[in-house]
């Protein structure tokens, strides 16, 4: 072939080939797929696209990809109607045809620990994110409430009672870990674990007296709720009056003493406290609280196995003196994590002189009712409905662990339907961004948070909107649940704040995505020691690390976000490719597949598509079937195209070198003529077969220049062409154009400076005054990730 656009050479042969390719491109543009869209088939049992005689069982992939693409533009796939079709494609099935969960009566509830991060993290890791997390707020505009009896979904009709029993155990385990509130009444809930600062003002001293009256005290105001009997005077003159203040302990269900918040600062106020002991004796004590007194210390580490009673006073006559007790709601000292050690009792300094045997007998006598250990009562700034907003069911923890159960919480009413909410967006790296931020040639360590969502506390009023039940008790999420669309955004804020501080404090490259941390440093030994320091730093703040999923030592090859990452490249595991090729081989030509089955297939193809030589336009026929919810039929050429994509596996370089080549070819078009100009001075003018929209004529000339000259970049004065978004064009032409122009750069040049503007109007080209710019949008990368 003669050199293109050289005036000194005979370009008749070159022009003939260019004219031929231009007519082929025009035919693709003029052939419209609309006639083929949604054409119903004659009968479901008939293969309307039966394979020809001698059709090979496996796709022929020897031809180059460009030839396969051209063949797919001739032998087109088809869209069908909405009649029933095949629901299985290899091992894939429609979303409603997923393998049903099998109930396991031996399911074990996994160990769930108390995840309570220290609010000191706000000072240790300065960030504006904490104002959205301490506490997090969830305010739906409207809510649909369901009865308590509908709390557990009827996922297993043959094992309803067993299913509800295991769900009840699971919810109780979450309650014991401080993740749930348990409903007591319309205005009262109880929880376990260490209270947060914003919960202190709502804590209640809740205790029961023998006449059936339940007394709640919040912020110094007492409130009596009568059960049955009228009020009685139960203070006996011969009972001694002592102060028995306990911090963080509860003796009986609804029979507890709790120090509450004192909004009055240093004011003293007197109340009469009544203690209920199941032996029938009660003690009335006159107290004066002062927030200036010493604070009680609580070790809230383990659970108490032995039953605890309040330390009651002896039968000696009271002196009538008022004993000052500390108000501890604003100054509770606790250990880093956990609960009180078994057997310990926390009493005031004045009651330490009492005989322990006599003190314990009074409350341990006839202590048959169930006791709540280490619980707090809270009366939030909201009402606690005796209804639920989400439903529950259990599944296997994962495909490899079927002995443990996983709790699935369905709060889908907040993401779809009339109660749907618009959740905030947040920066999430795509593959292109990940390639540009990962450092090259550094050892890496990955960390994984344990129970990541359960680190995020909710405002008590927001918790009342997230109600679940096992059919007996109503629980509210005190920490963020996984079934709400707001939770990933909150987790992103949480890990981003931690990652920024880790990078600043330890001077290493840190990247966070959801509950995953990636640490990089040039020195492997230094990175190893730093990773231990990072784990200690996080654990001191009450943030739990899942060491089972954490890299024990620095490695060069790591699996992160589903990708296999080595020192210089990113790739996908070979097993994923083999599974996808197997699925494509099992496609039956001409058979009709249900659109939900195609939806799952497209999801798998999208994950591997960046690692192939294909583009998203190749999947548009399947997207059309999914959008219109109709059946889809593969053609032989289209199946070959998909198989060819999975054969052309490539690995992507980390930190690819960006080059800005100098433009040497320019194109321009009018409704009737198109021109290609070369920097050497040669040019060629072509006449279109018909008048079309100008953006299509411009794209035709750019594609022709790519086919005939194969430049590294092309100048064009069409923004439509430079942006490379061709969704509005017929599919086969859009696919070919995207395939041709993806590898090269397109620069925008104003029409007055376009060198090809003259030849398209039968004037000489002008390359003297050239002004151009790329229109591709720069990839957003956070500032802290740009430096390395």
Swiss-Prot record:
* Any single Pfam family the record assigns to this protein: DNA_pol_viral_N
Protein EC: 2.7.7.7, 2.7.7.49, 3.1.26.4
Keywords recorded for this protein, A-Z: DNA replication, DNA-binding, DNA-directed DNA polymerase, Endonuclease, Hydrolase, Magnesium, Metal-binding, Multifunctional enzyme, Nuclease, Nucleotidyltransferase, RNA-directed DNA polymerase, Transferase
Biological processes annotated in GO: DNA replication
Give the span(s) annotated as RnaseH domain (RH).
656-788
Q: Where is the composition biased (Basic and acidic residues)?
A: 363-373
Domain of life, per UniProt, equals: Viruses
Q: Where is the Reverse transcriptase domain?
A: 376-565
In alphabetical order, the GO MF annotations are:
DNA binding; DNA-directed DNA polymerase activity; metal ion binding; RNA-directed DNA polymerase activity; RNA-DNA hybrid ribonuclease activity
Catalyses: DNA(n) + a 2'-deoxyribonucleoside 5'-triphosphate = DNA(n+1) + diphosphate; Endonucleolytic cleavage to 5'-phosphomonoester
Q: Where is this site: Priming of reverse-transcription by covalently linking the first nucleotide of the (-)DNA?
A: 96
Q: Where is this region: Spacer?
A: 201-365
Spans of biased composition, class Polar residues?
Answer: 286-298, 326-351
Residues binding Mg(2+) are: 448, 515-516
Renumbered residue ranges of the record's region Polymerase/reverse transcriptase domain (RT): 366-655
Q: Which PANTHER family match?
A: REVERSE TRANSCRIPTASE DOMAIN-CONTAINING PROTEIN (PTHR33050), RIBONUCLEASE H (PTHR33050:SF7)
Q: What does this protein do?
A: Multifunctional enzyme that converts the viral RNA genome into dsDNA in viral cytoplasmic capsids. This enzyme displays a DNA polymerase activity that can copy either DNA or RNA templates, and a ribonuclease H (RNase H) activity that cleaves the RNA strand of RNA-DNA heteroduplexes in a partially processive 3'- to 5'-endonucleasic mode. Neo-synthesized pregenomic RNA (pgRNA) are encapsidated together with the P protein, and reverse-transcribed inside the nucleocapsid.
Report the sequence similarity comment from the record.
Belongs to the hepadnaviridae P protein family.
Domain topic, free-text comment: Terminal protein domain (TP) is hepadnavirus-specific. Spacer domain is highly variable and separates the TP and RT domains. Polymerase/reverse-transcriptase domain (RT) and ribonuclease H domain (RH) are similar to retrovirus reverse transcriptase/RNase H. The polymerase/reverse transcriptase (RT) and ribonuclease H (RH) domains are structured in five subdomains: finger, palm, thumb, connection and RNase H. Within the palm subdomain, the 'primer grip' region is thought to be involved in the positioning of the primer terminus for accommodating the incoming nucleotide. The RH domain stabilizes the association of RT with primer-template.
Q: What name is this protein filed under?
A: Protein P
Give the originating organism. Answer: Duck hepatitis B virus (isolate brown Shanghai duck S5) (DHBV)
């Amino acid at each position: 072939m003669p050199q293109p656009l050289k005036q000194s050479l005979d370009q008749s042969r070159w022009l003939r080939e260019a004219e031929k390719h231009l007519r082929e491109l025009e035919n693709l543009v003029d052939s419209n797929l609309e006639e083929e869209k949604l054409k119903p088939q004659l009968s479901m049992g008939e293969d309307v696209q039966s394979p020809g005689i001698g059709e090979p069982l496996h796709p022929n992939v020897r031809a180059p990809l460009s030839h396969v693409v051209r063949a797919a533009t001739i032998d087109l796939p088809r869209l069908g109607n909405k009649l029933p079709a095949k629901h299985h494609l290899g091992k894939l099935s429609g979303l409603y045809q997923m393998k049903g969960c099998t109930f396991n009566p031996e399911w074990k509830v996994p160990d769930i620990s108390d995840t309570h991060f220290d609010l000191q993290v706000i000072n240790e890791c300065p960030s504006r994110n904490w104002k959205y997390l301490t506490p997090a707020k969830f305010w739906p505009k409207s809510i649909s409430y369901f009865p308590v009896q509908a709390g557990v979904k009827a996922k297993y009709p043959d094992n309803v009672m067993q299913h509800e029993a295991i769900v009840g155990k699971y919810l109780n385990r979450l309650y014991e870990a401080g993740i749930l509130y348990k409903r007591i009444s319309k205005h009262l809930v109880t929880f376990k674990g260490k209270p947060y600062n914003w919960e202190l003002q709502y804590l209640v001293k809740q205790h029961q007296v023998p006449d059936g009256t339940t007394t709640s005290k919040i912020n110094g105001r007492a409130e009596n709720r009568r059960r049955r009997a009228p009020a009685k005077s139960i203070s006996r003159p011969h009972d001694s009056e002592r102060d028995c203040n306990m911090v963080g302990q509860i003796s009986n269900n609804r029979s507890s003493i709790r120090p509450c918040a004192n909004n009055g600062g240093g004011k003293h106020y007197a109340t009469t406290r009544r203690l209920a002991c199941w032996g029938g004796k009660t003690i009335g004590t006159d107290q004066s609280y002062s927030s200036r007194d010493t604070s009680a210390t609580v070790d809230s580490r383990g659970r108490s196995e032995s039953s605890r009673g309040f330390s009651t006073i002896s039968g000696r006559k009271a002196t009538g003196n008022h004993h000052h007790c500390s108000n501890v709601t604003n100054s509770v000292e606790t250990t880093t994590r956990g609960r009180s050690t078994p057997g310990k009792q926390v009493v005031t300094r004045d009651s330490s002189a009492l005989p322990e045997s006599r003190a314990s007998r009074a409350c341990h006598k006839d202590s048959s009712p169930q006791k709540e250990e280490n619980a707090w009562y809270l009366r939030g700034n909201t009402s606690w409905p005796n209804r639920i907003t989400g439903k529950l069911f259990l599944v296997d923890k994962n495909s490899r662990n079927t002995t443990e159960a996983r709790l699935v919480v369905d709060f889908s009413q907040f993401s779809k339907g009339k109660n749907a909410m618009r959740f905030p967006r947040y920066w999430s790296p795509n593959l292109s961004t990940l390639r540009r931020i990962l450092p090259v040639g550094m050892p890496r360590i990955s960390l994984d948070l344990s129970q990541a969502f359960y680190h995020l506390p909710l405002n008590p009023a927001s918790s009342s909107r997230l109600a679940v039940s096992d059919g007996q008790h109503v629980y509210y999420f005190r920490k963020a649940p996984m079934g709400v669309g707001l939770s990933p955004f909150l987790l992103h804020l949480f890990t981003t704040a931690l990652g920024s501080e880790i990078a600043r404090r330890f001077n290493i490259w840190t990247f966070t995505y959801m509950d995953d941390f990636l640490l990089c440093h040039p020195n492997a030994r230094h990175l190893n020691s730093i990773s231990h320091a990072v784990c200690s730093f996080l654990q001191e703040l009450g943030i739990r690390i899942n060491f089972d999923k954490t890299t024990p030592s620095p490695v060069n090859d790591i699996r992160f976000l589903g990708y296999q990452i080595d020192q210089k490249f990113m790739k996908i595991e070979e097993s994923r490719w083999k599974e996808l090729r197997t699925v494509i081989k099992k496609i039956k030509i001409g058979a009709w597949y249900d659109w939900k089955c195609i939806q799952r297939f497209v999801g798998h193809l999208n994950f591997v598509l960046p690692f192939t030589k294909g583009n998203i336009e190749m999947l548009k026929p399947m997207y059309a079937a999914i959008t219109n919810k109709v059946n889809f039929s593969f053609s032989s050429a289209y199946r070959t195209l998909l198989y060819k994509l999975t054969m052309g596996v490539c690995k992507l370089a980390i930190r690819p070198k960006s080059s800005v080549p100098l433009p040497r070819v320019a194109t321009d078009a009018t409704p009737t003529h198109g021109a290609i100009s070369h920097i050497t001075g040669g040019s060629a003018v072509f006449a279109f077969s018909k008048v079309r929209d100008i953006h299509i004529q411009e794209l035709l000339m750019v594609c022709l220049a790519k086919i005939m000259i194969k430049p590294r970049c092309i100048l064009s004065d069409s923004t439509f062409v430079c942006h490379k978004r061709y969704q509005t064009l017929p599919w086969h032409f859009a696919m070919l154009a995207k395939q041709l122009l993806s590898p090269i750069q397109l620069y925008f040049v104003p029409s007055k400076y376009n060198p090809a503007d003259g030849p398209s109007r039968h004037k000489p080209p002008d390359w003297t005054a050239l002004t151009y710019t790329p229109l591709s949008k720069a990839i957003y990368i956070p500032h802290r990730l740009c430096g390395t």
